Design a protein with these regions (language model features):
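Juxtamembrane helix-loop-helix connectors linking adjacent transmembrane helices
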Residues: 1-27
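Transmembrane alpha-helix/helix-exit interface in multi-pass inner-membrane proteins
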Residues: 24-45
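Cytosolic/stromal cytosol-facing helical appendages immediately following the last transmembrane segment
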Residues: 8-9, 41-154
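Hydrophobic alpha-helical transmembrane segments of multi-pass membrane proteins
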Residues: 17, 21, 33-34, 64-65, ...
Length: 154
C-alpha cells in the first residue's frame, strides 16, 4: 500500500505548487476555526487561557498551551491537510518547518508583518488566523494595536 507521500513523488511543479497553496490555506482555515472554538468561554477558561497568560507575547508563547489546544489547533489543523491532499516528502518537510517557525514570529514584536497577533493577545476577540485574510472574511480583523506605545510599534 502506497502512502500519500509516495503517491506524490512524481507531481509536476505546478501541481505541487497547487498542493502547497491548498495545504497552507486548509491548515489556516482549520486553525482559524479551532482557535475561535478555543475562545468560547468554557474552552477559554479551561484550555486556551494558558496560552493567553502572555499578554505581551514572546516566541515561546507560540508553544505555551494546554495539551488539548496543541492537539486541536497546532497539530490536527496542520496534519490533516497533508493526509488528505498529500505532497512529496521535501515539500512536507518545508511546510512543517515553516509551520513550526512562523508561529514563533507571530508571538514577537520584531516583525511588523505579524503585529496583528499582538492585538489578539491584548483584546482576545480579534485576529484568530494567520495572515489576516480569514479574519477579514469572517469579520474578526482588527488592524490597529490596542496599546502600540507599550510595544514600541507606533
Amino acid at each position: 500500500m502506497q502512502t500519500v507521500i509516495e503517491d506524490s513523488v512524481n507531481d509536476s511543479i505546478l501541481f505541487s505548487m497547487w498542493k502547497i497553496f491548498l495545504i497552507i490555506n486548509i491548515s489556516n482555515l482549520f486553525f482559524y476555526w479551532f482557535h475561535r472554538l478555543l475562545h468560547v468561554p468554557f474552552m477559554f477558561r479551561y484550555v486556551h487561557s494558558k496560552h493567553h497568560e502572555f499578554i505581551e507575547p514572546i516566541g515561546v508563547a507560540a508553544l505555551y498551551a494546554h495539551p488539548i489546544e496543541h492537539f486541536l489547533a497546532n497539530t490536527f489543523s496542520f496534519i490533516c491537510p497533508f493526509l488528505y491532499i498529500g505532497c512529496n516528502y521535501y515539500i512536507m518537510l518545508g511546510l512543517l518547518f515553516g509551520g513550526s517557525i512562523i508561529p514563533v514570529f507571530y508571538h514577537t514584536k520584531s516583525f511588523r508583518f505579524f503585529n496583528d497577533h499582538l492585538v489578539h493577545h491584548q483584546l482576545f476577540k480579534y485576529n484568530f488566523g494567520f495572515g489576516g485574510y480569514l479574519d477579514k472574511i469572517f469579520g474578526t480583523y482588527n488592524g490597529g494595536l490596542a496599546n502600540s506605545a507599550k510595544y514600541n510599534l507606533a
